[in-house]
């Protein structure tokens, strides 16, 4: 009888040990899955927003944005840089500089200061009218084509076809303008 009781106790202990081991493995796997989900919720959760000046809602997360958001931001940056007069150029360029990374602001300040000086000296007014917009959200790239009308003093407007490429990055909930460049268009 001692022999049978001892085997029965060993079996119960073995089954209990296996059961506890299975519970520990399940608990660890659930904790890992929960940790991954928490990370994704914290960094990849998208918020849908509809701004005042635009009709199309957009979605943003901590480190990414959809095509609609990138398009609207790029059009806002274009307006801040190109829809200016001698009275508004300083305020517009100052607002644009807030979206440039702090390390690149000095270079952009020089470019914008030269533009502002020419605009003020020649009493220039300009307006940009977009004709097409293409967005690549995975790269943060926005290409905008349009017509730039420029008035110098009281003259008739000069019309130029322009093609701009803007690179936008979204990091830690902040949108940065990495590049604001003009490219030559072969279709002129």
Curated annotation (Swiss-Prot):
Keywords: Conjugation, Plasmid. It holds the Pfam family TraE. Belongs to the TraE family. Involved in F pilus assembly. It comes from Escherichia coli (strain K12). This is Protein TraE. The gene is traE.
């Amino acid at each position: 009888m001692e022999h049978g009781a001892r085997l029965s106790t060993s079996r119960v202990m073995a089954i209990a040990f296996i059961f506890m081991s299975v519970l520990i493995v399940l608990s660890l796997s659930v904790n890992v899955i929960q940790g991954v989900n928490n990370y994704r919720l914290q960094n990849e959760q998208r918020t849908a927003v509809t701004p005042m000046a635009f009709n199309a809602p957009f979605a943003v997360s901590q480190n990414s944005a959809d095509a609609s958001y990138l398009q609207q931001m790029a059009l806002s940056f274009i307006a801040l840089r190109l829809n200016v007069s001698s009275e508004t150029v300083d305020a517009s360029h100052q607002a644009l500089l807030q979206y440039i990374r702090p390390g690149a602001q000095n270079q952009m300040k020089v470019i914008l200061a030269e533009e502002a000086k020419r605009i003020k000296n020649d009493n220039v007014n300009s307006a940009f009218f977009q004709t097409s917009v293409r967005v690549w959200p995975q790269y943060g790239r926005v290409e905008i084509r349009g017509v730039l009308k420029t008035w110098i003093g009281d003259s008739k407007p000069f019309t130029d076809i322009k093609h701009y490429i803007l690179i936008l990055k979204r990091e830690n909930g902040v949108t940065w303008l990495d590049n604001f460049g003009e490219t030559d268009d072969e279709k002129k």
